[in-house]
């Protein structure tokens, strides 16, 4: 599975709780490869913030080629993301991480621990 860096367009963005945002991104090449448990790195458009923000993929729609990320606004980078509107774009890198081996876990008890906001 190849990591891809691409420009991704915001399809929809909304605040779903105090300081928690949900964003759908158009990312066909990443969406077709992504597995549960993986994440993307989202790059700020403000060039003063060099490091991307790692954000878990919350939902994948392979047919539409879209990804949903849910994140907490905690600093300048995620604050910038929270102000994005449909049609805005960000560079993203992904899919990253090993994901969850869903097929291997069928019929077994599994313990999962989430970090961040638990998505």
Could you say what each language-model-derived stretch is?
Residues 2-86:
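Ferredoxin-reductase
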Residues 76-119:
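FNR/FR-type flavoprotein reductase catalytic core
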């Amino acid at each position: 599975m190849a990591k891809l860096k691409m420009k991704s367009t915001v399809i929809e963005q909304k605040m779903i709780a105090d300081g928690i945002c949900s964003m759908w991104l158009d990312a066909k090449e990443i969406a077709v490869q992504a597995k549960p448990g993986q994440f993307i790195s989202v790059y700020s458009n403000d060039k003063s913030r060099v490091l991307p923000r790692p954000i878990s993929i919350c939902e994948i729609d392979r047919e539409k080629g879209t990804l949903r990320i849910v994140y907490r606004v905690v600093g300048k980078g995620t604050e910038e993301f929270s102000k994005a509107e449909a049609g805005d774009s960000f560079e993203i890198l992904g899919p990253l991480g090993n994901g969850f081996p869903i097929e291997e876990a069928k019929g077994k008890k599994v313990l999962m621990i989430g970090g961040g906001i638990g998505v």
